[in-house]
Amino acid sequence: MGKDKKASGSGSGSKGGKDAGNKDAGKDAGKASKGAQSINVRHILCEKHGKKEEALAKIRDGADFGAVAREYSEDKARTGGSLGWKQKGTLDPEFEKVAFALETSSTSSPKIGEVKTQFGYHIIMVEGKK
């Protein structure tokens, strides 16, 4: 995943502020209709499909996501695969599509997604949304 792209034309400088024109959207309803604008995301990046499958098997067998990332990931391995908080528009489009669709979960019981990008094969989990 390496380098982040700057979001172009993201317009509003507001950080999670409420829309004055959308009065009937409550806190939760606004998130459901608009979706998260940033996620706290981890991933395991593998160049080879076989290595990704090995990592997936360990996670499905109950291994901690961070521990598997440290063992298998070719990117961010030392941080347990953590990319930190990322805003919409700053990640690879294919990666972002999968990541923003995932439910939040913990490293000990991750809800994961998979995607292949120009960088390789990713196993993705999301720890938080806002």
From Swiss-Prot:
Ranges annotated as biased composition (Basic and acidic residues): 16-31
Family from the record: Belongs to the PpiC/parvulin rotamase family. PIN4 subfamily.
InterPro entries referenced in this protein's UniProt entry, alphabetically: PIN4, PPIase_dom_sf, PPIase_PpiC
Residues of the PpiC domain: 36-128
Any GO molecular function: DNA binding
Gene Ontology annotations of biological process type: rRNA processing
Protein name: Peptidyl-prolyl cis-trans isomerase pin4
Gene3D superfamilies: 3.10.50.40
Top EC class for this record: isomerase
Catalytic activity: [protein]-peptidylproline (omega=180) = [protein]-peptidylproline (omega=0)
tRNA processing among keywords: no
Disordered, as annotated region: 1-38
Function noted in UniProt: PPIases accelerate the folding of proteins. It catalyzes the cis-trans isomerization of proline imidic peptide bonds in oligopeptides.
Keyword Isomerase: yes
Annotated Gene Ontology cellular component terms: nucleus
Intrachain S-S bonds: none
